[in-house]
């Protein structure tokens, strides 16, 4: 399926200092991977679960 363009963005932790475990879609490996999110800002390539990431962006 056509994945949204934000799936191609690099994970962005944003400007806050939280340490939230989130998932992002990695275009090169075609996998949903973990990164740590600060809690504000960032971009749309940021999911709470791997399933949500896979449903939106595809990948493994």
Curated annotation (Swiss-Prot):
Cystines in this chain: 7-57, 16-40, 32-53
Coiled coil spans: none
Main location: secreted
Gene Ontology molecular function: any one: serine-type endopeptidase inhibitor activity
Site (Reactive bond for trypsin): 17-18
Annotated tissue distribution: Expressed by the venom gland.
Alphabetized Pfam families for the sequence: Kunitz_BPTI (PF00014)
GO cellular-component term (any): extracellular space
Localization of this protein: Secreted
Entry keyword set: Disulfide bond, Protease inhibitor, Secreted, Serine protease inhibitor
Domain BPTI/Kunitz inhibitor residue range list: 7-57
Assigned protein family: Belongs to the venom Kunitz-type family.
Role played: Serine protease inhibitor.
Entry protein name: Kunitz-type serine protease inhibitor 2
Annotated source species: Daboia siamensis
Lineage of origin: Eukaryota, Metazoa, Chordata, Craniata, Vertebrata
């Amino acid at each position: 399926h056509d994945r949204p363009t934000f799936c191609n963005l690099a994970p962005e932790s944003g400007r806050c200092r939280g340490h939230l475990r989130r998932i992002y879609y990695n275009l090169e490996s075609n996998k949903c991977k973990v990164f740590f999110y600060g809690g504000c800002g960032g971009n749309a390539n940021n999911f709470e679960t791997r399933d949500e990431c896979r449903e939106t962006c595809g990948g493994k």
